[in-house]
Structure formats: structure tokens, C-alpha cells
Amino acid sequence: MLIIFLFFYFCYGFNEPLNVVSHLNHDWFLFGDSRSDCNHINNLKIKNFDYLDIHPSLCNNGKISSSAGDSIFKSFHFTRFYNYTGEGDQIIFYEGVNFNPYHRFKCFPNGSNDVWLLNKVRFYRALYSNMAFFRYLTFVDIPYNVSLSKFNSCKSDILSLNNPIFINYSKEVYFTLLGCSLYLVPLCLFKSNFSQYYYNIDTGSVYGFSNVVYPDLDCIYISLKPGSYKVSTTAPFLSLPTKALCFDKSKQFVPVQVVDSRWNNERASDISLSVACQLPYCYFRNSSANYVGKYDINHGDSGFISILSGLLYNVSCISYYGVFLYDNFTSIWPYYSFGRCPTSSIIKHPICVYDFLPIILQGILLCLALLFVVFLLFLLYNDKSH
């Protein structure tokens, strides 16, 4: 019976992938919002940690940059700003919900929130893919050495755009990016028959964009190397970047991990993060159930608490299907894996069917287990005979 039990244990239930975000070692960092903002407790009527989706023991480890009511996308574009800053080899994102269809943002009354959700997808796709190659992330301002007569034609009752800004195009405008390895800047246009370009004066590279389709501010997000750039357009006004995401301290490729950031079903959410988070640069984790918090309906959900609980311990392997605690055997192939990963061959096939070396190792383990049981029975028999 013991042999049968061990056989099925090793073949069908050992070291299955876990639906959590975690890390291979202590060199990790999390970017989040109120669900991981430990300082937000000071602003709450009921001062407890039930609103968190992370374990409170993580609050003072210096590995979290989070702010209630904020998101990296919102801070990138609008006057509502939090300087997300952090460094780590393995990067986790759990934010984004604070800009979604529930806020219904658009530049004009006849504009389109759908355009902004498309902008959100493009932004996070660029953020995730870049962050797989860099350890450090922060915001930087883009200075201009000329006086700019700007106008703001994009704001709502809750948000006001300040990246990019718009100026009348009367002369050439330049900006310089120095100090970081890579920058993410917006290039945005309203619906028109015009185009705009960034020219790298040092290399001659040209980055251009035109928008003749979308009835709102349509943006692409361009990764620029350090250098001096000239802004040119065929339109009567320029859109100028004022803030950039700074990527620094390059590393070997490490996929980022993204946890879905959404409301309870009573509020409208979107799928921008899952669309933006694609292999091979990003692993996406989600709960199959509705978000139902215990502090309030949008804070403290047990499913997402379970996903974030993986931050409490190191794992051996991170993959598309989940994380693996051990590096020995598994019944699920660690697809697009990173770390010290278990051996297996065919997705969703039990290991005992095909992997020859693990079968030999399992046979040795089973024989040792059998000999141990026989030895215990022998000792028990001798003890009774005396």
C-alpha cells in the first residue's frame, strides 16, 4: 500500500504550480496602490490592515512602492502624481485599477474613454517589456530651456493632463534626456491629418506618429536612449513630453509578474493589464472569482490575498502556469520558465508516463522506502518476541 501511495503521490500530486506571485531570492520589488500601501492605514476610519491584499509583515521590508488612489499610468499622464520608485531583480506589479472605465476619463465631452483604455494597454506593454531588462524604475521631469506658452485642452472634473503639454508651434523645440539608461516618453496627437516627430540629434533616429482615427488624445509610448531630441510637427501646435519613466541598472532578462488590478463587479473594470502582459516578458496572475473585500467591497479579497501570499517565501521556479516550490519533478511542464525549474516533458501529462530519468530516481526512492518499512517491521517483531 505504501508503494502505491508513493507512486501516485509522485506521479499525480507532487510539486504542482501555484497561482501566486513570488521571487527566487530576496532581490525583488513590488509596485502597487492602496491594496499594498501600508501607510494608508493612517487615513482610515477603522485602523486595521484588512484593506491590504499583502501580508502586513511585508510592510517594513523596503521592497514596496505603493500609493492609495494612484497608478503608474495616472502618475505618468496627470497632475495627480506619486513618484513610483524602486529597484529589484524580480519586479511585481499590482496596480492599474485607479484608471479604468469606472473613471470614464476623456479629454472632451464628445471624446472617448475607449481611446484612453487603448493608451493604457500601450503604456503598460512598454513598461512591462522594458522592466524585464532593468532593475531600477522612477519618474524624471523633462526640462525645457525656453519659455513655453502652454495650454491644457485635456481635463475632466477629476483629472488634468500635464504630460504631454501643448504649445503653439512657432519655433523648433528641443529636449535632452540624461542620467538614465532608457526613457519612456509619450507621443500623443488628437484626431487630425497631421503628424509629429521626435528626432535624435545625435544618432539621426526618427520617431513619428499620426492620428486620423481616434476621437480623443491618441498616444504611443516610445523608448528613447539618452540624447538630445528635436520635436517637429506638421500641425499648428506641438505636444511636448514633460515626464518620463526612467529605467536604469540593466540586468539579464527577467520576466515581470503582474497581478490583475480590478474592482468588485459592481464597478466597471477593464482587461488592459492582461492584454499588455504577454510572454515572454511578463507573467499574468488572476483570481477566477469576483473581487469581494473584507474591509470594504474593493479591499481585502481572499483570492488576491492568496495570490500575493507568495511574496512571503522564495520559490525555485517561476513560469507561465505558476510558481514551483521545488526543482525536482512536476506533472506540469514549466512553460516559459525562469529559475531552477523541475524536470518534465509534455504539458499536462503525468511524469511517470514519459520521463525516463525521474522514473529511475523514483524507483530508487521507492525501494529505499520499502526497505525502511521492512526494517521497522523487523524491529517491531523482535521487540514483541522479547
From Swiss-Prot:
Glycosylation sites per record: 83, 110, 145, 168, 286, 328
Any idea where this protein resides? Virion membrane; Host cell membrane
- Region annotated Esterase domain 1, chain positions: 1-121
Q: Where is the active site?
A: 34 (nucleophile), 296 (charge relay system), 299 (charge relay system)
- Cysteines engaged in disulfide bonds, as pairs: 38-59, 107-154, 180-246, 188-219, 277-282, 317-341
**Segments traversing the membrane:** 360-380
Return the protein name.
Hemagglutinin-esterase
Lineage at the top is: Viruses, Riboviria, Orthornavirae, Pisuviricota, Pisoniviricetes
